[in-house]
Amino acid sequence: MVHIKRAYEPARSADGQRILIDRLWPRGLRKDKAHFDEWLKAIAPSDQLRKWFGHDPRRWEEFRQRYRRELDTPAAQELLEGLARRAGHGTVTLIYSAHDEFHNDAVVLAEELARIMAGGKRPARRASTPGSSRARA
């Protein structure tokens, strides 16, 4: 089972394995007060993507697509499959620090883990055609 939770919320036993999935440590959170079992920076969006997104909900759909492309590497897939196996045997809580509970990297990871756990395959990427780019500046 996969849950997502903000880093600043209190830890609960029902959280199971608490895994911080942000590249940066949560601002203002003391390490001795953080109850994380693991800090998995390698699965976080790249610095470039994180800065581009800036937690702007208008960029959410594009962020999801770009982040999924970043997750489409052998190393990231291995990490995702490992998380999915753990979630199949117990509860895994993905911990994030963003203020927006609906537009953050943990939401995308939870969707990807649900897809893997359901035995789903990634949809094939469509080839780009001229004028089809949706990148926003």
Which sequence ranges carry the predicted segments?
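Residues lining hydrophobic/aromatic ligand-binding pockets adjacent to catalytic sites
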Residues: 1-137
